[in-house]
UniProtKB/Swiss-Prot annotation:
Belongs to the AB hydrolase superfamily. It is found in: Late endosome membrane; Lysosome membrane; Mitochondrion membrane. Residues 1-19 are extracellular. Its main location: membrane. Its EC number is 3.1.1.23. Lipase that preferentially hydrolysis medium-chain saturated monoacylglycerols including 2-arachidonoylglycerol. Through 2-arachidonoylglycerol degradation may regulate endocannabinoid signaling pathways. Also has a lysophosphatidyl lipase activity with a preference for lysophosphatidylglycerol among other lysophospholipids. Also able to degrade bis(monoacylglycero)phosphate (BMP) and constitutes the major enzyme for BMP catabolism. This is Monoacylglycerol lipase abhd6-B.
Amino acid sequence: MDIDVLNMFLVAGGTLLVPLLAFMTSFLLWPAALIRIYYWYWRRALGMQVKYSSYGNYKFCYTARGKPGNKPSVLMLHGFSAHKDMWLGMVKFLPKNLHLVCVDMPGHEGTSRSALDYYSICGQVKRIHQFVESIGLNKKPFHLVGTSMGGNVAGVYAAQHPTHISSLTLICPAGLMYPIESKFLKQLKVLEKSGDNQRIPLIPSTAGEMEDMLRLCSFVRFKIPQQVLQGLIDERIPHNEFYRKLFLALVDEKSRHSLHENMNKIMAPTQIIWGKQDQVLDVSGAEVLAGSLRGCQVEILENCGHSVVMERPRKSAKLMTDFLSSLQSTDNHKKHD
């Protein structure tokens, strides 16, 4: 009897041990695969469905939750070398009754990458306009959100297509003339003088460089296991040549100050969110936008770096939700007057 009981525990223990060993082996040997599983799980948990749309031969990949309703739909544009899933932390805290759309920017993740594509800000705005038309998002004005590179694209889109945009949230956007030069922009100047475009801090190729990039982008010091860092690098390395091409297009004269050159054409109510300790794009950019956009709402987050959406997802979601609610309240008052 005792032997039977012992065997039962051994069988039970073995049953539990097999998946545990499989997990440990996967973690050690295929960390990139586990990162993909992680995003798949959170998309599923949050009700974000992966979808595709086409404009001619060009394919867009995006995630969506909900359907268009009385409130404006929300389109979210990620930053350089990121992807649609970077918004998941913020999506978790957004109201379930909002129609959300997070698209992979041109050349990123599941969206087409073409050698013939023009990756300047104007080129990306054109592609995002095609995406908007392909899913019929512009049937009525929508709220547009963008961070970093995506903020640059969002701002220029709002300037060029004012009738499409009900309101705008720019999170530490690129494309401005910043009164104070950031740590990253200083590093960039040194690289430009030397003619070295292989050591761009935002394009890491080792786990150590990945750690340096995270320290540059984030005020919060996340404790990330070495295997996860390696997984992140394994995911990025096949795309680094594209990221380099894209980066050079973004810092070219035609794109570097695109938002600055177009900000006076933005008509939509605008919200600006910036991390006070941003080392990539200095927070002084918020003053530049506030000086040009009449009545815009500025939110500066203490103890927060460039990766606002990753560092402060709950706060970012609340600020955007409150902003949208205040606009709806203003519209309701106008209707009753």
